[in-house]
From Swiss-Prot:
GO function terms (MF aspect): ADP binding; ATP binding; phosphoglycerate kinase activity
Cited HAMAP family: Phosphoglyc_kinase
Coiled-coil positions: none
Cellular compartment(s): Cytoplasm
Gene: pgk
PANTHER family reported for this sequence: PHOSPHOGLYCERATE KINASE (PTHR11406), PHOSPHOGLYCERATE KINASE 1, CHLOROPLASTIC-RELATED (PTHR11406:SF23)
Catalytic class of the enzyme: transferase
Record family assignment: Belongs to the phosphoglycerate kinase family.
Species lineage: Bacteria, Bacillati, Mycoplasmatota, Mycoplasmoidales, Mycoplasmoidaceae
Source organism per UniProt: Mycoplasma pneumoniae (strain ATCC 29342 / M129 / Subtype 1) (Mycoplasmoides pneumoniae)
Protein name: Phosphoglycerate kinase
Pathway involvement of the protein, from the record: Carbohydrate degradation; glycolysis; pyruvate from D-glyceraldehyde 3-phosphate: step 2/5
Length: 409
C-alpha cells in the first residue's frame, strides 16, 4: 500500500513544479550510452506537461568529487538535449547553474508548458575553491531551501536515490508545502511492496554482485520473508571462505568472513544456497576459464586462481529452485558480466527466471537489468526496477529516507 500523495492529488494548472527525476545515465565521452532512465521518467513529465505547468527539473549525474568533474564531463547538458529529442513539441531549456540569481530569473521567465533542466545537483558537492563540501549528498538545509523556493509543488520521481537523504529529495520535501511522488516512483513502490507483503510462495531471491557489505542488511531481512536465498557473484566467495573453502585470489571481504559465518550458522532452515562450482582464471582477464568444484582445496595447477563466474552445476542448481518459484527477486550478476567469457552464469540465470512465467519476477536494477536487455527477454519479467540500491534497501527492511518527508495521503 503506497501511502504517499501521488500526482493525481494536485491541480498543476499554472503552477511551477520542481521535479526530481533520476536521469543518472551512463555516458562515454559526453555521449549517452543507455537512455533507459530518461525514458522511464517520461510518463511523469508528460503527465505534468498535460496539466499546463512549468517544470524545473533536477537530477544528479554520477559522483562529483573535484573541480575537474565540474568542467563539463558530468554536465546534464547532453541529458537536456536527449530530453528535447524525445519531447519534440515541448521546449526544453538547459541552465548551466543550479543555484543563485540566474536560476531564479530563468525559472521566472520560463513559460508554462516548458521545461528547465538545472545543472547536475552534485555539482553542489564541490565548492568554487575545489573543497568537497557535499551540500547535495549531505542534505544541506540552505541548498534544500533554495530549491524548494523555486516551485509551488515538489514531485519526487527519482526512485534510484530514494534510499539517500539528499538536499534534492528529502531536503526539498521538508521545506516545501506541497509534495507528492511521481508515476515511476509509485510504480516502483507498488511492485516492490508486493515482494515484502505476503508474496506468493515459494519466494526465491537471487543475490550476486561483488560485495557482501552492500547486501548484508538484505540477507538478514530476507530470512523473514524468503524461502530460498541463492548467492553467486563475487559476494559468494566471502561465504565460501567462511565455510573453509578455497577461494584463491578471488575477491573476498576479509573483515566480513566472520559475519558471513554467523549468518550461515543462524540459518537454521537452510534458506541460503551457495554456488557449488566456479569458473576460474589465473588473472582478471577476459579469457576462457577452467570450471572447478567448490572444495577446501583446489587442484595444484589452479592454486592462486580467482573465481570470475558461477559454473554449470551452480546454474543447474539455481535453475531448479527458480523453476518452482512463485515470487522471484534478482539483484546482482553471477560473475564478471562485462567479460564475455564470464557473462554466461548471469545470462543463464536471467533465462531461467524468464522461463518461469507463473512467477511474479522482479529485477532490482543494474547489471541484472542489463543482462535481461542483452538477452532481449526484459519484457518477460513482471517488473524491472530502475534503482538497484533503493530496491535492495526496501527489500532489506530499510526506510526509504529520500521520500519519507513526502506528504501522506
Amino acid at each position: 500500500m503506497v501511502d504517499f500523495k501521488t500526482v493525481q492529488a494536485f491541480d498543476f494548472q499554472g503552477k511551477t513544479v520542481v521535479l526530481r527525476a533520476d536521469l543518472n545515465v551512463p555516458m562515454k565521452d559526453g555521449v549517452i550510452t543507455d537512455n533507459e532512465r530518461i525514458l522511464a521518467s517520461l510518463d511523469t513529465i508528460k503527465y505534468l506537461l498535460g496539466h499546463n505547468c512549468k517544470i524545473v527539473l533536477l537530477s544528479h549525474l554520477s559522483r562529483v568529487k573535484s573541480l575537474d568533474d565540474k568542467k563539463g564531463k558530468k554536465s546534464l547538458q547532453p541529458v537536456a538535449s536527449a530530453l528535447q529529442n524525445l519531447l519534440k513539441n515541448t521546449k526544453v531549456h538547459f541552465c548551466p547553474e543550479n543555484t543563485g540569481d540566474k536560476v531564479k530569473v530563468a525559472v521566472n521567465q520560463l513559460p508554462l508548458g516548458e521545461i528547465l533542466v538545472l545543472e547536475n545537483t552534485r555539482y553542489c558537492d564541490v565548492n568554487e575553491a575545489g573543497e568537497v563540501v557535499k551540500h547535495e549528498s549531505k542534505n544541506n538545509a540552505e541548498l534544500a531551501q533554495f530549491w524548494a523556493s523555486l516551485g509551488d509543488i515538489f514531485v519526487n520521481d527519482a526512485f534510484g536515490t530514494a534510499h539517500r537523504r539528499h538536499a534534492s529529495n528529502a531536503g526539498i520535501a521538508k521545506y516545501i508545502k506541497n509534495s507528492c511522488i511521481g508515476l515511476l516512483m509509485e510504480r516502483e513502490l507498488i511492485n516492490l511492496y508486493r515482494l515484502i507483503n505476503n508474496p506468493p510462495k515459494p519466494f526465491v531471491v537471487v543475490l550476486g554482485g561483488a560485495k557482501v557489505s552492500d547486501k548484508l542488511q538484505v540477507v538478514n531481512n530476507l530470512f523473514k520473508i524468503a524461502d530460498h536465498i541463492l548467492i553467486g557473484g563475487g559476494m559468494v566467495n566471502t561465504f565460501l571462505k567462511a565455510l573453509g573453502n578455497e577461494v584463491g585470489t578471488s575477491l573476498v571481504e576479509e573483515d566480513l568472513v566472520q559475519t558471513a559465518k554467523q549468518i550461515l550458522d543462524s540459518d537454521k532452515d537452510k534458506k541460503i544456497v551457495l554456488g557449488v562450482d566456479q569458473m576460474l582464471h589465473a588473472s582478471f582477464k577476459d579469457e576462457p576459464g577452467v570450471e572447478c568444484v567448490v572444495a577446501p582445496q583446489w587442484p595444484a595447477e589452479l592454486q592462486g586462481f580467482m573465481s570470475l563466474d558461477v559454473g554449470s552445476k551452480t546454474v543447474a542448481l539455481f535453475s531448479s529452485y527458480l523453476a518452482k518459484a512463485k515470487t522471484i527477486f534478482w539483484n546482482g550478476p553471477m560473475g564478471v558480466f562485462e567479460f564475455s567469457n564470464y557473462a554466461q552464469g548471469t545470462l543463464a540465470i536471467g533465462k531461467a527466471i524468464a522461463q518461469n512465467q507463473q512467477a511474479f519476477s522482479v529485477i532490482g536494477g543494474g547489471d541484472s537489468a542489463a543482462a535481461a536487455k542483452q538477452l532481449q527477454i526484459a519484457d518477460q519479467f513482471s517488473f524491472i526496477s530502475t534503482g538497484g540500491g533503493a530496491s535492495l534497501a526496501l527489500i532489506g527492511g530499510e526506510e526509504l529516507v529520500g521520500i519519507s518527508d513526502i506528504q501522506k495521503k
